[in-house]
Amino acid sequence: ENKLNYYQPYKFQKSFHQAGSESNQRLLMAANRVGKSYVGAMEMAAHLTGLYPKWWTGKRYNQPIKAWVCGASNETTRDICQKELFGQPDNPRDKGKGSIPKHLIGETTRKPGVPNAHSSVMVKHKSGGWSRVAFKAYEMGAEKFMGESLDLIWLDEEPPQDIYSQCITRTLDRRGQVYLTFTPESGMTEVVQNFTSNLRPGQALITAGWEDAEHLT
């Protein structure tokens, strides 16, 4: 069954979505297993489809969007982000069991050399057009993050600073958004400090520990 229809966010997840109404850069910095990738996928699904829950007070796109979903490697992006959005990658019968309903999933392009991985997917937007989401991996290098103009980028797992900077640039033309979901495994990196030490207008930091995730308490 599709997850978007039944999404009841925890308080920290709702705060993260809500922050999108006034912040173009958001970081959900949270402990392992609290549902970071889940909330990231729910945010992406709502924007790709235009199907916003009744309680939604965050950013809204009233037209189809161009988006990227990015992770550390092609494999982790497939196993985490693609799975959360579209269902178990190695089981075709699972299509539509992620955050995006099956009947809204359109043309899918496979990623060469990575079994069961998507390169891009067309998603039907409620306005009638088609959104496009492409999958990227940090291991590809910053040069692979150049060129396109985008509405929305989700970075799941902490990116290198040069890739984060490229992603900000990619969204400037369209006044788009970049949001990050990760556990700070590498300490006080430049990316983390952007949000913890040097928070500027248009940025938001939401933190969560195990006590904030009701399924763990």
Residue ranges of predicted features:
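Phosphate/NTP-binding elements of NTP-utilizing enzymes
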Residues: 1-217
